[in-house]
Each structure stands twice: as C-alpha cells, then as structure tokens.
C-alpha cells in the first residue's frame, strides 16, 4: 500500500492496525472510499472520491463501468513484476523445528493438507488468525470467516456453528487459540446437543500469544497477564461436554492425526500443542509506517 497510487476502500475503517503512522500512510495514493455509513467517510483518511451506499449495488455498477473501458492492461506489467520481485525477496518462511515439536506455522500447513484446502475455516483473534491467513492457501473466496480488525476473541466457534448449519454439506473447521476458545467454550454444549459437525483445532501455546509478542518486542519482555499458569485440560473439558477429543504433540504424525479427527463423525476438539515462543511476522510496530514493518 505504501507504493499504491490508487486505493479503493470498501467498508474500511482505516484503523491504526491498517494505517500504522497515519500521516505517512500511502503518501502517493488517491482514495476512493465506499461505505454505507457516511460518518466513516474521511474520518481517518481523506477521501478523494467518497461514495455512500450499499456495496451490493455500488460494486456491480462500478464493475460494469470498468468492463466498458478499453483498458491497456499491459501497463500493469511493470507493477506485477515488482510485486513478484517482492515475493521472491521477502518470502513467507519459518525455521522448522529440528525435533518433533509442532511449529504453529506447520500446524496450519498440516491442516491445509489434511482438509485438501476445501474446508470452510473460521478463526478467532491473535497469532493463529495471522498464521491462518499466511499458511492456509484458500483456493476460492468465502472460505475464511473471521472478525478481522474488530478483534473479537470467542468469535471462531459460534461462527463455525453458523457456517455448518448454513452449509451442512461443507467441511467446517474452527482454528482457535487456547485463550480465545475460553471466551465461548460453553458453545461446545451447543455442538454436542444439536450434533453440529464442526472440527475445532486449538493452537495451544500456553499464552495470549499476540499480546505476549507485543510485550516481548515493544515492552522489554515485561510480561503481564499473558502466560497461562493454570489452563484447563481441553481434551478432558471437551469430553466432559460429551465431545470426542484428541491431543496432538508430534509433527511427524500430525497430518494423519488431523485426517483421523476430520473423519470422526460429529463434533471433535483437537488440542494441538505448539512451540510456545514463536512470533508471527511481519508486523507493524506501534506508531510506525507500514514500510518499516518488523520481520
């Protein structure tokens, strides 16, 4: 975005998680801002072209106008080449563990392999949410349901329930953290009572991982209320609700164990123990522009 010359924002709030340092956000860009709420237009970023209305009608109208243009798409070639260059220079990568420990990135890769990339995936908020975005390569739209920048811990499990009820023939997977799952853990009872076939995979790192990462990087490791010294045994907790549950600790068997869980009839909870101190990158430090992201 830092090098964009035009940004078309659809329902965006331009909050600080997107912009970083506001007065240095996309300095060369013109902004088209579409929102149903006029109060959001130009609230944080001045809109050069404000459009107030429902995207359900606005986007088809804009698409019709765009397709009527005889645009020279070859003009995009240098820009696309530049993007490919960035991908080669800054690939998503991580240092895999030398033993059988499960890295959180690998957990998502394993889940992608186990599901064949065909599941509807819901997620909560935190590191696991970012890793789902990076390592579960969604082949088509409307496959990932999350609360985005709203930061709604506890969203993932109810969203998975709704997705499964709405799309009963689709495989539905909830990826959550050991913090987020406890925000709405009572909905395990809903899954069992109504026999809603969702598969829940807890990325268990023993902490509120995203907050811990911020305190590590920006608060001199002054940790406060982020490590879970006492957490429930999630397998026993799920079983107490009458749900089948598995614990996964070995990366060499992870894909097969995930496949077995996915093939188990009815709702299932999987407690996946991942390396506890892994950080998710890249990220924008507080008060910094996007071009100076960490990692």
PLM regions with names:
Residues 1-79, 258:
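Glycine-rich, acidic loop regions that bind phosphate or pyrophosphate groups
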Residues 5, 11-14, 59-70, 83, ...:
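Structural signal for hydrophobic packing residues in well-ordered secondary-structure cores
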Residues 10-11, 125, 176, 273:
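Glycine-rich, N-terminal phosphate-binding loop of Rossmann-like dinucleotide-binding domains
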Residues 72, 84-89, 97-100, 286-295:
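Conserved acidic/glycine
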Residues 82-158, 163:
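Active-site diphosphate/adenylate-binding microenvironment
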